[in-house]
Swiss-Prot record:
The EC number(s) this enzyme carries: 2.7.1.161
Function: Catalyzes the CTP-dependent phosphorylation of riboflavin (vitamin B2) to form flavin mononucleotide (FMN).
Region (Riboflavin kinase), start-end ranges: 90-225
Cofactor note: Binds 1 Mg(2+) ion per subunit.
Gene3D superfamilies with a match to the protein in the record: Riboflavin kinase-like, Winged helix-like DNA-binding domain superfamily/Winged helix DNA-binding domain
Catalyzed reaction equations: riboflavin + CTP = CDP + FMN + H(+)
Family, similarity comment: Belongs to the archaeal riboflavin kinase family.
Cofactor(s), by name: Mg(2+)
Protein name: Riboflavin kinase
Binding site for CDP: G99, L100, G101, E102, G103, Q104, I198, K199, L200, R201
UniProt binding sites for Mg(2+): T128, N130
GO biological-process terms attached to the record: FMN biosynthetic process; riboflavin biosynthetic process
HAMAP family for the chain: Riboflavin_kinase
Organism placement in taxonomy: Archaea, Methanobacteriati, Methanobacteriota, Stenosarchaea group, Methanomicrobia
GN (gene name): ribK
Amino acid sequence: MPDIKYLKKLALIGAINKIIKVSSSEFQKHTGASSKTTARKLKQLEDERLIERKIVPGGQLIKMTDKGIEVLKNEYVDYSRIFSPDLDILELEGKVLKGLGEGQYYVNIPGYRKQFEEKLHFVPFPGTLNVQLSESSSSLRNLLLETPAIRVEGFNDGERTFGGGKCYPVVVGSIEAAVVVPERTHYPSDLIEIIAPIKLRDALKLKDGDRVVVQLKKQGTENQK
């Protein structure tokens, strides 16, 4: 189990976004631990691949890995659940961009399209709105994935097998929509793909780079999680 305290301290002094140079004695001031303990904790973080570290004259170069950042994001989600247990609406903010098209692929296959109509109660427009989440909202993506979802079942059409996925009902600019998350996906952790009954880009006059707010309404129970 990683020592979150030391990982958090590294993030606070900048190692989450860039390579920083810090000596053991300097980092010791941030942790309040002995130099021996500080050195041991840094070695543990490196061994667990939560940080990348290189010893250089005058100190060491340190940068958090994607795995280390994910550990802190999960910690953030836990604290959000502790201090905001009755939060009814989760807001995610990001910018519109051209995406990977996985959600669009789902929308245009009859076996999926029928389920969307039955379970989301709308016929989806044959396309998606792709949103790259801001840094703060990216941290909340895990919280979104832990909320009750609407299950989209996988199926076989006689020629090939299609995997399942989950949908999270959302509102985008007062329009009912849903975030689509395939079971097997190549999405970056900061990207979400949204389907809706109409073309959101046209309805909301959005273009690449525009800011958009996505509101997730928590459901009472998940539909076949």
